[in-house]
Regions:
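Short, small-residue-biased leader/transition segments that mark boundaries at the very start
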Residues: 2-3
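Short, polar/acidic, helix-capping and beta-turn segments at strand->helix junctions
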Residues: 6-20, 24-104
Length: 104
């Protein structure tokens, strides 16, 4: 059965790459905005694979769970919005994959 295979699947690999890239984009955004990014910054990408409305094709969805401990909510929002505009992964999938953010 294809679902019982061991190892990493493509969705997990995409999530790992997106998470790492988004952390880098937040660090660049922090430097640009003058907002210090905490050392404990974390991004966990939850990538889902599902059928489209018609059921004929598959599509990805992403929820980035972002932890920026110690920063005020407004600074967290600014970092995430700016990073989303500059992150290469965000740019590559813009308009094709829905991305949601959960900021803690």
């Amino acid at each position: 059965d294809v679902y019982k295979r061991q190892g990493t699947n493509p969705e997990q690999l995409f999530g790992i790459g997106y998470s790492a890239c988004f952390i880098g984009a937040m660090q660049l955004a922090g430097a640009k905005l003058g907002i210090p990014v905490p050392r404990e910054v974390a991004v966990d990408a939850e990538v889902s694979l599902g059928k489209t409305d018609g059921g004929a094709t598959y599509a990805l969805g992403v929820n980035l769970h972002i932890s920026l401990p110690g920063l005020p909510a407004e600074q967290q929002r600014q970092l995430v919005e700016t990073a989303h505009q500059t992150c290469p992964y965000s740019g590559a999938i813009r308009g094709n994959i829905d991305v949601e953010f959960s900021i803690a």
